[in-house]
Amino acid sequence: MKALSKLKAEEGIWMTDVPEPEVGHNDLLIKIRKTAICGTDVHIYNWDEWSQKTIPVPMVVGHEYVGEVVGIGQEVKGFKIGDRVSGEGHITCGHCRNCRGGRTHLCRNTTGVGVNRPGCFAEYLVIPAFNAFKIPDNISDDLASIFDPFGNAVHTALSFDLVGEDVLVSGAGPIGVMAAAVAKHVGARHVVITDVNEYRLELARKMGVTRAVNVAKESLNDVMAELGMTEGFDVGLEMSGAPPAFRTMLDTMNHGGRIAMLGIPPSDMSIDWTKVIFKGLFIKGIYGREMFETWYKMAALIQSGLDLSPIITHRFSVDDFQKGFDAMCSGQSGKVILSWD
């Protein structure tokens, strides 16, 4: 079958032919319809330090997808041929304390689709049936293909009560923009997103944020004053991994504020911890999606009117995958969809 693989320990992704995966007793075989390119895939494409330490070569990559069930393991129940599915990209062990306690998103033995095992940038994918999620009929293939990153946004945004709160989102990448849209949709008062990329700030404006602030040109304190905010932000969603953005967030949080961190900062990032202590801030790390509460919330948010369509900016045939990666690497894109039909 046709697949996009990391064939060499150098920059690039290559189209190749690999054997169709075999279906185990507890697995589903999924015929891929559409995939989306993730920032992780760009890291793998660029063969950065993290990729060199993490990715086995050769490896079929990719973990954002929608497809159709075409094969079912003999022990699987609850699925039928033709079901339209996406799937949780974190494969968990099922045996550790967190898995057995229902906190599977915190499994210490997690492996990643398209990172530690073959991914979805292929005509067919095999995953455990436990990881598959049926897509409601009124959700399009395009939206279903970005459920994985949308789930990161939903998990982060819904970590805390947002109704009537003032929310700061640092980082206007696709996940940050989706998190801001979720916050506004569920009843936050002011949702302010910051970045230095004007293209992506404009995407955030299309998604309905209160203010999209280019911090290279505008002071966040001035924006807060303009909005009548006198006590700081109640909730912070840190999506950038940029130390200056996190420090600004700490400066502008209200006392007792709550911060959810999805962005990955440098390991040696320094902050003024007295601000965390004396403001009584609560900081929560976010990894992946809650299984499967986040997935149900994703579907419900879209069904209740949340419009994510502006975040999908580029669509290509998989044969034009290089154009898709070029768009992602340019910084002038939202989500990029590859069609396998």
From Swiss-Prot:
Q: Which residues bind Zn(2+) 1?
A: 38, 63-64
Q: So, what pathway does this thing act in?
A: Amino-acid degradation; L-threonine degradation via oxydo-reductase pathway; glycine from L-threonine: step 1/2
For this protein, what does the record note about how its cofactor is bound?
Answer: Binds 2 Zn(2+) ions per subunit.
Protein name per UniProt = L-threonine 3-dehydrogenase
Q: Which GO terms describe its cellular component?
A: cytoplasm
Main EC class the enzyme belongs to: oxidoreductase
> What's a single GO BP term from this record?
L-threonine catabolic process to glycine
Catalysed reactions, semicolon-separated? L-threonine + NAD(+) = (2S)-2-amino-3-oxobutanoate + NADH + H(+)
In terms of PANTHER family, this protein maps to: L-THREONINE 3-DEHYDROGENASE (PTHR43401:SF2)
User: By its UniProt entry, which Gene3D superfamilies does this protein fall under?
Assistant: Medium-chain alcohol dehydrogenases, catalytic domain (3.90.180.10), NAD(P)-binding Rossmann-like Domain (3.40.50.720)
Q: Where does NAD(+) bind?
A: 175, 195, 200, 262-264, 286-287
Q: Which Pfam families match?
A: ADH_N, ADH_zinc_N
- Identify the HAMAP family for this entry: Thr_dehydrog (MF_00627)
List, in alphabetical order, the Gene Ontology terms for molecular function in this entry: L-threonine 3-dehydrogenase activity; zinc ion binding
Q: What is the lineage of its organism?
A: Bacteria, Pseudomonadati, Pseudomonadota, Gammaproteobacteria, Enterobacterales
UniProt lists the gene as: tdh
